[in-house]
Amino acid sequence: MARTKQTARKSTGAKAPRKQLASKAARKSAPATGGIKKPHR
């Protein structure tokens, strides 16, 4: 379940990078995105 959720989230973010999705993705993998520093702080 966790793997599916992560994959789905990453897939959605890559397909349609939205502000909300990007924020959630950045929070889970801030180093991977390395783009938004606000959610991490």
From Swiss-Prot:
InterPro entries (UniProt xref): Histone-fold (IPR009072), Histone_H3/CENP-A (IPR000164)
PROSITE patterns to which the protein is assigned, alphabetical: HISTONE_H3_1
Any one cellular-component term (Gene Ontology): nucleosome
Region named Disordered: 1-41
Lyase found in the keyword field: no
Molecular-function GO terms, alphabetical: DNA binding; protein heterodimerization activity; structural constituent of chromatin
Record has DNA-binding as a keyword: yes
Subcellular location: Nucleus; Chromosome
Origin: domain of life: Eukaryota
UniProt keywords, alphabetically: Chromosome, DNA-binding, Nucleosome core, Nucleus
Signal sequence, renumbered to the chain: none
Quaternary organization: The nucleosome is a histone octamer containing two molecules each of H2A, H2B, H3 and H4 assembled in one H3-H4 heterotetramer and two H2A-H2B heterodimers. The octamer wraps approximately 147 bp of DNA.
Function: Core component of nucleosome. Nucleosomes wrap and compact DNA into chromatin, limiting DNA accessibility to the cellular machineries which require DNA as a template. Histones thereby play a central role in transcription regulation, DNA repair, DNA replication and chromosomal stability. DNA accessibility is regulated via a complex set of post-translational modifications of histones, also called histone code, and nucleosome remodeling.
Family statement drawn from the similarity comment of this UniProt entry: Belongs to the histone H3 family.
UniProt name for this protein: Histone H3.2
Species whose genome carries this gene: Tetrahymena americanis
